[in-house]
Amino acid sequence: MNSNINKTVTLINKGMFPYKEAWDYQAFLFNQILEIKSDNRNIAIEEQKETPNYLITCEHPPVYTLGKSGDEKNLLLDNAQLQNVGATYFHINRGGDITFHGPGQLVVYPIIDLENFFTDIHQYMRLLEEAVILTCKDFGIEAGRIKGLTGVWIGERDSARKICAMGVKTS
């Protein structure tokens, strides 16, 4: 077992960040982690390097993203309409369906080696939800979960509105 477990998470605030640049930056950081993990396989435990953990925060110009399990029919705008409203569209390899990101909306991308913490993806998702719920509380917003659904919601179940969508890719 690697004794170089790193529980530090580096916060990177990118401000307004075009979606494609954010996607490429995430891939760059992710590949750095993979390279360290690959190199660590070939050296003695005491010489292994820690893998870093990052939390990227940003806003995006108007963009719609569609996850692997999504349905393109849920994007209600065609290419001309997207262009007319100044939005872009990307089909990406995270979970989830269609999501809109725009100015004023905080977007958070954790690039984390879960082996530094735990590897239970369901526990990870619930902890992310809990972080959002507690952050909402700090702003006087009562938020919570809806059984069987991923994300964070405000309001009662029959009239709930999603305040936080979540889609992750694990590898």
Where are these regions (language model features)?
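N-terminal lobe of the biotin/lipoate ligase/transferase fold
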Residues: M1-A160
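Catalytic cores of processing enzymes, dominated by hydrolases/peptidases
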Residues: R161-S171
